[in-house]
UniProtKB/Swiss-Prot annotation:
Keywords on record: ATP-binding, Nucleotide-binding, Transferase
UniProt-listed GO biological process terms: prosthetic group biosynthetic process
Function: Involved in the formation of 2-(5''-phosphoribosyl)-3'-dephosphocoenzyme-A, the prosthetic group of the acyl-carrier protein of the malonate decarboxylase.
Origin species: Pseudomonas paraeruginosa (strain DSM 24068 / PA7) (Pseudomonas aeruginosa (strain PA7))
Protein name: Probable 2-(5''-triphosphoribosyl)-3'-dephosphocoenzyme-A synthase
EC code: 2.4.2.52
HAMAP family to which the protein is assigned, alphabetical: MdcB (MF_01883)
Length: 293
């Protein structure tokens, strides 16, 4: 990739490698988490005819150079402005090309490139300040800047935004990822504190996001009916005690069947779960970097 060639020399220490590792690990852990309603996981393809777990893993790995270069660019530039936004946009597009080459044209992680790319850059800008809300707010400040080289919006997500009047991934980022920071992460921590295992805590975090997100992936596939089924079903699982309880597990199976019948896959919520996992691990991962930067 050559988009950041003019952003000066190699950063001190390899913060970029650490952040790229965290981002890729978050994507792989999200993909492998099971049983997720209507999403690719260890059981199968969910509502996706063109995706499977191996492809999701390979796609995530293909994005490591993209995330590293985003972190390096932010660390070199050291401030949020239009120039950094343009560089990150170009790197994201190059990362998307690498992803599509790996998946032979299947869009497996376009939304994740956007969300995790912003968070990686935000973390690199201030590696001593790793509190989730602060990192997400910095990412939001980057997202508020326009990318002059971005293509005109005619993606599925853009069309859904216009049709249904929802904010989508762009607004979620510009607001500082509130569904991840205010819903997903608190639920992850609550479930851990209540004694749930890590996989159940992550499932509960996903459900908390699903319960409040206007997921454009679901709206694209199943409209308002699908969105209501996702949100109400996720709330029902949590109200029944979460994915670690017998009643919650029954509700989770019902939600999975309902979303599969509607061909509604909550891909936006999955991207935000990966963002949660990244933010959750960030303080421990960067604790050793603070003294050397």
């Amino acid at each position: 990739m050559n988009a950041i060639a003019n952003l000066a020399a190699t950063p001190r220490a390899d913060l970029g490698e650490c952040l790229a590792d965290l981002a890729v690990d978050a994507l792989i852990d999200e993909a492998e988490l099971s049983p997720k309603p209507a999403l690719v996981d260890r059981r199968g393809n969910g509502a996706h005819a063109d995706l499977h777990l191996g492809l999701m893993q390979a796609s995530a790995l293909s994005l490591w150079p993209c995330f590293k270069e985003m972190a390096d660019a932010a660390q070199r530039h050291a401030r949020i402005d239009a120039r950094l936004r343009g560089v990150l946009g170009q790197l994201g597009r190059e990362g998307e090309v690498a992803m599509l080459r790996t998946t032979e044209g299947v869009n497996s992680h376009r939304g994740a490139i956007w969300a995790l790319g912003l968070l990686v850059a935000a973390a690199a800008l201030a590696p001593r300040r790793t509190q989730a809300g602060e990192v997400a707010a910095r990412a939001g400040r980057i997202a508020l800047l326009d990318d002059p080289a971005a293509a005109s919006g005619d993606s599925h997500g853009e069309r859904v935004r216009r049709r249904y009047g929802v904010g989508g991934a762009r607004e979620e980022a510009r607001l500082g990822f509130p569904r991840a920071v205010r819903h997903g992460l608190p639920q992850l921590w609550r479930s851990r504190e209540s004694g749930a295992g890590e996989q159940n805590a992550r499932l509960d975090a996903l459900l908390a996001i699903m319960s409040v997100l206007d997921d454009t992936c679901v709206l694209h596939r199943a409209g308002r009916v699908g969105l209501a089924a996702m949100q109400e079903g996720a709330r029902a699982v949590l109200a029944a005690g979460g994915s670690a309880s017998l009643a919650g597990r029954r509700r989770l199976r019902e939600l999975d069947r309902r979303l599969l019948a509607l061909n509604a896959s909550p891909g936006g919520a999955a991207d935000l779960l990966a963002a949660c996992l990244f933010l959750d691990r960030l303080p421990a991962a960067l604790g050793g970097w603070a003294g050397s930067l």
